[in-house]
Amino acid sequence: MMAEEHTDLEAQIVKDIHFKEIDLVNRDPKNINEDIVKVDFEDVIAEPVGTYSFDGVWKVSYTTFTVSKYWCYRLLSTLLGVPLALLWGFLFACISFCHIWAVVPCIKSYLIEIQCISHIYSLCIRTFCNPLFAALGQVCSNIKVMLRKEV
């Protein structure tokens, strides 16, 4: 009985990961498009002082821009949204797969192999460079500099 409840709970957790509720009101909860895609009429078209068009033209232009942008986006998202979501899902799945099964193991392998080399390198530095720089430090420690200001 207890094992069945545990299995049901695991199945529920897996189901929740793949079928979570999405927010239809706030569709950018992490604000990834805050400054990039938000383009309004005033961001694109502006008339400097002294070169104004007729008020009616300005109002119709504003309405035309806003409505055409709105409906063009809706049309494009209707036609291309699902295929592009499929494409991006596939692409990020491939990237995740490569990262999990190729990149991380290569990095771990490299770190294991480089550890042996780093010990040898450290030994060489301590054996050859440390005495050399210590001797140079002793030689240069007796150098005295006097500054004299001549008037």
From Swiss-Prot:
Crosslink feature (Glycyl lysine isopeptide (Lys-Gly) (interchain with G-Cter in SUMO3)) location: 38
Main location: Golgi
Keyword Isomerase carried by entry: no
UniProt-listed Pfam families: Caveolin
Keywords: Cell membrane, Golgi apparatus, Isopeptide bond, Membrane, Ubl conjugation
Signal sequence range: none
Metal-binding keyword on record: no
Bilayer topology term: Peripheral membrane protein
Compartment annotation: Golgi apparatus membrane; Cell membrane; Membrane, Caveola; Cell membrane, Sarcolemma
GO molecular function terms listed in the Swiss-Prot or TrEMBL record: alpha-tubulin binding; calcium channel regulator activity; connexin binding; molecular adaptor activity; protein-containing complex binding; sodium channel regulator activity; transmembrane transporter binding
Post-translational modification: Sumoylation with SUMO3 by PIAS4 may reduce agonist-induced internalization and desensitization of adrenergic receptor ABRD2.
GO BP term (any one): establishment of localization in cell
GO cellular component: caveola; dystrophin-associated glycoprotein complex; endoplasmic reticulum; Golgi membrane; sarcolemma; T-tubule
InterPro entries: Caveolin, Caveolin_CS
Function: May act as a scaffolding protein within caveolar membranes. Interacts directly with G-protein alpha subunits and can functionally regulate their activity. May also regulate voltage-gated potassium channels. Plays a role in the sarcolemma repair mechanism of both skeletal muscle and cardiomyocytes that permits rapid resealing of membranes disrupted by mechanical stress. Mediates the recruitment of CAVIN2 and CAVIN3 proteins to the caveolae.
Similarity comment text for this entry: Belongs to the caveolin family.
Subunit architecture: Homooligomer. Interacts with DYSF. Interacts with DLG1 and KCNA5; forms a ternary complex. Interacts with DAG1 (via its C-terminal); the interaction prevents binding of DAG1 with DMD. Interacts with TRIM72. Interacts with MUSK; may regulate MUSK signaling. Interacts with POPDC1. Interacts with CAVIN1, CAVIN2 and CAVIN4.
Protein name: Caveolin-3
Record gene name: CAV3
